[in-house]
Amino acid sequence: MSIGKLHKQAKEKVDRSQVYPIGEALALVKEVAHAKFDETVEISVRLGVDPRKADQMVRGAVVLPNGLGKDVKVLVFAKGEKAIEAKEAGADYVGGDDLVAKIQEGWFDFDTAIATPDMMGTVGKIGRLLGPRGLMPNPKVGTVTFEVGKATSEAKSGKVEYRVEKAGIVHAPVGKVSFDAEKLQENLVALFDALVKAKPATAKGTYFKKMSLSSTMGPGINVDLPTVQALVK
């Protein structure tokens, strides 16, 4: 059967006018995934914030309890003892000017970048290359730190960075369709809890406006927010 027909069948199983309790939504996102690869499950949350205002920016990171189901390649800008610490924690690439030179030549074979504060002068040379790709180390999400061992371990175990976009929407992965629905739910709740804690003090009115789930190639599934909020401690 063609990809087009499979996608059409998947869309027909989802009622776009309905909001599904989180348990049903997770079961459905697994059911309608039709690609030949292990699709990523993503959530999209619309928040009642205006990201154009500096005091309403929602940004942070959270370690998902069940990881992301993929091998995360970690690059660390560090030297001396900190370079050794990063390597021992499992970093895939550790260095300084040598890595900067590779990146300037167009090499981006890594998923996340971490740097010690004293290396940021070096990293700054490639900020215009890393920034647009979401790879620039940032202290707000714990990727500019002297605790490179801890940061590397967290990245390897499934740390997800999130940031609200122009329309007040946060997109983030919560696992793979091959995950048990329970594991996906645990990851989703961890991310949702992080968003609750990241609520700006200046945000007025309803904070969580809308939420949907989808797999990489699948249709969006609207989620009943109260069924998620009930799971957050």
From Swiss-Prot:
The keyword Metal-binding does not apply. GO terms for cellular component: cytosolic large ribosomal subunit. It comes from the Bacteria. InterPro entries: Ribosom_uL1_bac-type, Ribosomal_uL1, Ribosomal_uL1-like, Ribosomal_uL1/biogenesis, Ribosomal_uL1_3-a/b-sand, Ribosomal_uL1_CS. Signal peptide: none annotated. GO terms for biological process: regulation of translation; translation. Pfam families: Ribosomal_L1. Belongs to the universal ribosomal protein uL1 family. Part of the 50S ribosomal subunit. HAMAP family: Ribosomal_uL1_B (MF_01318_B). This is Large ribosomal subunit protein uL1. It comes from Syntrophotalea carbinolica (strain DSM 2380 / NBRC 103641 / GraBd1). The gene is rplA.
